[in-house]
């Protein structure tokens, strides 16, 4: 009877140890992945701010927009030319001061693609910020629909939770959203 109890105790210790190692491994990989994603977006932000090399391909960019009759888009802003060379589906950049939100905005005909892919078109559980397939940056509008995950780590749109605080809203009333063709500043009207 005593030997059976000793065996059960040892088995329980081994099982608990295996579970603990598995949990530590999972959280280690999870944290590493979040750090890697943050570093990737920091590099993209630096690439955005870097001057484009002269003589880079200046061909017109074809975007996936609601109206495909637009044949000659306006010139691309210099700060987005380097990123556009990485992925022609780049449509803009969204930034909110004092948050982690400082990301490229993608657009494609498939609204689900960028739920789990990044600008480099690699699998990324954080996905990307992306514009609805039916929005057209070439048509004047005061409304664009942007999608992104609300990550618990604060990445992507995770820091939007701060807007539930009235004083935070008053201190941060604007969102900067630039298309690759023009800069834009949008006032936040409602939070829900």
State what each model feature region is.
Residues 10-21:
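Hydrophobic H-region at the start of alpha-helical membrane spans
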Residues 1-8:
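N-terminal Lys/Arg-rich, disordered targeting/topogenic segments
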Residues 20-192:
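Solvent-exposed, non-transmembrane regions of membrane-associated and secreted proteins
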């Amino acid at each position: 009877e005593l030997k059976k109890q000793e065996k059960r105790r040892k088995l329980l210790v081994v099982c608990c140890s295996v579970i603990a190692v598995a949990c530590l491994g999972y959280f280690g990989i999870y944290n590493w992945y979040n750090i890697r994603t943050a570093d990737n977006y920091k590099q993209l932000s630096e690439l955005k701010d870097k001057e484009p090399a002269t003589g880079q391909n200046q061909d017109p960019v074809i975007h996936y927009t609601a109206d495909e009759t637009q044949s000659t888009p306006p010139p691309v802003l210099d700060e987005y030319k380097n990123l556009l060379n990485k992925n022609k589906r780049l449509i803009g950049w969204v930034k909110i001061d004092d948050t982690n939100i400082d990301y490229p905005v993608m657009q494609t005909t498939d609204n689900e693609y960028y739920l789990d892919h990044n600008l480099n078109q690699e699998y990324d559980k954080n996905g990307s910020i992306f514009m609805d397939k039916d929005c057209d940056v070439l048509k004047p509008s005061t409304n664009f629909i942007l999608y992104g995950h609300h990550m618990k780590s604060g990445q992507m749109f995770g820091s939007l939770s701060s807007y539930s605080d009235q004083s935070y809203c008053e201190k941060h009333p604007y969102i900067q959203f630039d298309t690759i063709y023009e800069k834009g500043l949008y006032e936040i009207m409602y939070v829900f």
